[in-house]
Each structure stands twice: as C-alpha cells, then as structure tokens.
Amino acid sequence: MAELFEITRLIYAEPSAIFELLTTPEGHVAIDSSGMLQSAEGSPVSAVDDEFVVHMDRESLNDLPMGKYDVRVIITAFEKDRWIEWTIIGTVRPPLDHRYGYRLEPTDDGTLVTSYYDWSRVTNEDIKGRFPIIPEAGLRATLGILARTVENR
C-alpha cells in the first residue's frame, strides 16, 4: 500500500503569495478542509525547526474520541517560495513523524502546487494501520481552498 499522497494543482498566483500564506499559522487554519484545525498561535515560520501551535478538534473526522487537543507544528524543510514541510507533535508519544508539505513550481500562468502527505516514517505498526488519517480527497479540497484564498486577494 502507498504511504504517500501527492496532489498537484495549477494556482493562478505567484509562488511568493502562496508561500506567504503557508508560512503563517493562521494560513494553515484558513485552508484546512478537514475541519480539524480550529485556531493557531505563533509567528510566521522562516526556517527548519521553527514551530507554532494549532488547536485541533478531532470531532470533524468522527474516527477517534480525542475531542479538543493541541499539536506543535515543526518545520522539517524550508526553501523560500519553493518548499515547506512539517511534522506534528501531538498526544502520541513518541511522535509519529508523518509529514505534510507543499512544493511550488512557478509557471507562466501562476504556480504549480503539489500538496503531499507522507506517513512512510511511522514505525508503530498498530498505529500505522490507521493511516492515512486525512484522505487524498482532503488534500485536493485543501488545494481548492488555497487557490480560492490566494487568487481572490
């Protein structure tokens, strides 16, 4: 079974406008299609190991009775206007090390944006059997919200 989803979409905006939104905690909440991200605290990120807090609510997935909880988003890759990736540290210990990210490629019409979700680093087989937590359609929907958000600025 695949341990990675990748979805690509052309967004009619400059890479810098897209990347700026992706570096802000509020931007993550604004484009989330799962309904889990409720609010966030922290400053925009600008380097690997930068982090911020997201207040979550698992109710929207209706899969586990976790209720409200917080996660720390930790940046694992950062190339300005090109690539951002992060993992989360939440309630599970040790952390699972699943990754989310965006790669941006400038085009004549805007930016080709690839969103990905990678759970290949998860080593706990019992937990790994529950992956993916976010479906591929969720990434596609989030890209749609991202497009709407930056194209209408």
Regions found by a protein language model. Give the residues of each.
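Short coil-to-beta transition motif at edge beta-strands of beta-rich domains
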Residues: 46-58
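Hydrophobic-ligand binding "helix-grip"
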Residues: 34, 59-112, 118-120, 148
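A conserved amphipathic terminal alpha-helix motif
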Residues: 112-153
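Hydrophobic pocket/interface hotspot
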Residues: 18-22, 28, 52, 75, ...
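Hydrophobic ligand-binding cavity/cleft-lining segments
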Residues: 1-48
